[in-house]
Amino acid sequence: MKSLVLLAILAALAVVTLCYESHESMESYELNPFINRRNANIFISPQQRWRAKVQERIRERSKPVHELNREACDDYRLCERYAMVYGYNAAYNRYFRERRGAK
């Protein structure tokens, strides 16, 4: 009987210890944690923003071949359905490579 009471007390202590809710885990105590766009843009300097835009434009111009093929396949519904089953490479080869060879 004593061991059962001791086990119950230990279990209660374990529950209290493990289920303790820490206030440190709360995201924010602030009333309004969001900031407006003007203040948010202060974090990134104009030069970094310009550099990011230039890099994005370069990536748009020089896309990999498989990405261009996938975009072409996404525009054609039958190719897109075929790609869901067999993959984009097989779908592109079926619907677009044959047309190039026929020319």
From Swiss-Prot:
Disulfide bonds listed in the record: C73-C79
Keywords, alphabetical: Chondrogenesis, Developmental protein, Differentiation, Disulfide bond, Gamma-carboxyglutamic acid, Osteogenesis, Phosphoprotein, Secreted, Signal
InterPro entries: GLA-like_dom_SF, GLA_domain, MGP, Osteocalcin/MGP
Modified residues (4-carboxyglutamate): E21, E56, E60, E67, E71
A GO biological process held by the record: regulation of bone mineralization
TM segment ranges: none
Keyword Repressor in record: no
Signal peptide positions on this chain: 1-19
Principal location listed in the UniProt entry: secreted
GO molecular function: calcium ion binding
GO annotation, cellular component aspect: extracellular matrix; extracellular region
Localization of this protein: Secreted
Maturation and modification: Requires vitamin K-dependent gamma-carboxylation for its function.
Prosegment location in residue numbers: 97-103
Family per record: Belongs to the osteocalcin/matrix Gla protein family.
Functional summary from the UniProt entry: Associates with the organic matrix of bone and cartilage. Thought to act as an inhibitor of bone formation.
Protein's name according to its UniProt entry: Matrix Gla protein
